[in-house]
Amino acid sequence: MSKVNEIIEIVKGLTVLELAELVKAMEEEFGVSAAAPVAAVAAVPAAAAPVVEEEEQTEFDVILKNVGNEKIKVIKVVREITGLGLKEAKELVDGAPNPVKEKVNKEEAETIKKKLEEVGAGIEIK
């Protein structure tokens, strides 16, 4: 079996959290980013006055900052929100701070934050 195939087989066996850790380690090791590249902005004609527009953020990340006193309840809510298995949800909660959901709209982010704060978790929306 080639090295590439061996690596693929190893990656297939990793959990979502392990994959996220792998990506982060590769980004740090090789000095790259796994983020999608942003398309270049078209040049503004010279005659037009520069217009400064701030784009409203449309995608948010919900970060579990701390668990609080109700760890089991937090794990249950994380499982409900993410669809993760018990082991993966526990690893996510134990490893706080961790992202619970990424690239969600503002309404969904606020709903997730409310559910987790109701069981005592500390949440941040980025």
UniProtKB/Swiss-Prot annotation:
- A Gene Ontology cellular-component term: cytosolic large ribosomal subunit
Q: Which PANTHER family match?
A: 39S RIBOSOMAL PROTEIN L12 (PTHR45987), LARGE RIBOSOMAL SUBUNIT PROTEIN BL12M (PTHR45987:SF4)
What subunit structure does UniProt give?
Homodimer. Part of the ribosomal stalk of the 50S ribosomal subunit. Forms a multimeric L10(L12)X complex, where L10 forms an elongated spine to which 2 to 4 L12 dimers bind in a sequential fashion. Binds GTP-bound translation factors.
**Function according to Swiss-Prot or TrEMBL:** Forms part of the ribosomal stalk which helps the ribosome interact with GTP-bound translation factors. Is thus essential for accurate translation.
Q: Which organism is it from?
A: Desulforudis audaxviator (strain MP104C)
The regions listed as transmembrane in this protein's record are none
- Gene3D superfamilies attached here? 3.30.1390.10, Single helix bin
GO molecular function, one example? mRNA binding
Specify whether Ribosomal protein is a keyword of the entry. yes
Name listed for the protein in its UniProt record: Large ribosomal subunit protein bL12
Q: Which family is this protein grouped under?
A: Belongs to the bacterial ribosomal protein bL12 family.
Q: Which InterPro entries match?
A: Ribosomal_bL12 (IPR000206), Ribosomal_bL12_C (IPR013823), Ribosomal_bL12_C/ClpS-like (IPR014719), Ribosomal_bL12_oligo (IPR008932), Ribosomal_bL12_oligo_N_sf (IPR036235)
- Underlying gene: rplL
Its GO biological process annotations read: translation
The UniProt keyword set, sorted, is:
Ribonucleoprotein, Ribosomal protein
